Amino acid sequence: MDVALKLLLLAALTLLASAQTPIDYKDLSTTLQEHIDKALEEGNRKFGGRHHVALDSFVTPAVTRQSILNVNVFLKVTTCMKTRSYKHRPECNTQKRSTPKINCLVCKMKNGTELVHCARKIDILHGEHKEIRDNCDVTRIGVSSLMAQTMPDDYRKQVGCLGCI
């Protein structure tokens, strides 16, 4: 039992570490780059001062489908000076000392409009800005599919229904 628990813990830590590894911007899809550019523009506007804000890593895996949009990334203030362009600059990768990580979220809201919101990572961890970010549509893929059917007031498995519970 101890071995299984240790393996499960190791798998969870590996997954957590892989979700926060640095990103190679040029390897991302054009659609994902467009949404990350929106986060970079907002991050530069709010936190950059005279320095460029750059992409650091994903907070969670990005979802960029027509009906669902959720891109959550960490940004960092770099040692590079700001230019007119807010877009990704591969030469700007060194984080400026004594600057916080920035958590930026680009999502589709429940009313169909797009939200671009950036805040310090520590503020997000302490629950600040929750009222803003809770406006994101958190629809999950497959929620309304046949595979997720349940019968109201009847918890028995339904015969002939693939995946009904």
From Swiss-Prot:
Keywords: Disulfide bond, Signal, Stress response. The keyword Disulfide bond applies. The lineage of its organism: Eukaryota, Metazoa, Chordata, Craniata, Vertebrata. Involved in hypoxia tolerance. It comes from Clarias batrachus. Induction: By oxidation stress as a result of either short or long periods of environmental hypoxia. Seems to have a cystatin/monellin-like domain. This is Cystatin-like protein. Disulfide bonds join 80-92, 104-118. GO terms for biological process: multicellular organismal response to stress. Residues 1-19 form the signal peptide.
